[in-house]
Amino acid sequence: MRHNKHRASLGVTVEHRRAMLSNLAAALITHGRIETTLVKAKALRPFVEKVITKAKQAAAKTDKKDALHLRRLAQSDVRDETAVTKLFNETYKEFANRNGGYTRIYKLGPQRIGDAAEMALIEFVKADDPGYKKSKGKKATKAKGKKAKATPAAEAAAAATTEAAPAEEKK
């Protein structure tokens, strides 16, 4: 029975899904952003964030054995040695002051031709990016009444200045 399976199966076997996520993670680490389907991007996000957390933990370890163990765990997930090397040497530094939320997903406009799959762009969040913050102020409400018109005296004064200006130019 399929009780409490909170993971997108992506319509493939377990081995295929692991290999696909590994390849997508390697491409994301190598290039910084990739274009894929929305469902794959949503499945990739927690996978990549766990690997980045392992890289951050390895950098914080003083014992080299523990750091090597975390590196090998990441290597077993990503399976691309150059991507893991880049992650552990360069990429993790961008996320030193960030606790989670290392990736961002943008939905792209039109669906893919052929199978009408929703496309998305997944990318790393930059170190200096503050991210989206909800405003804590009150929401703007619509005015209940119409705006009051300007007083007739103010309108007459504005009209007089516009009429007087062309008259001065003619002299």
Swiss-Prot record:
GO terms for cellular component: cytosolic large ribosomal subunit. Residues 130-171 are annotated as: Disordered. Pfam families: Ribosomal_L17. GO terms for biological process: translation. Residues 133-149 have a biased composition (Basic residues). Belongs to the bacterial ribosomal protein bL17 family. One of its GO terms (molecular function) is structural constituent of ribosome. Residues 150-165 have a biased composition (Low complexity). The gene is rplQ. This is Large ribosomal subunit protein bL17. Part of the 50S ribosomal subunit. Contacts protein L32. Keywords: Ribonucleoprotein, Ribosomal protein. Transmembrane segments: none annotated. SUPFAM superfamilies: Prokaryotic ribosomal protein L17 (SSF64263).
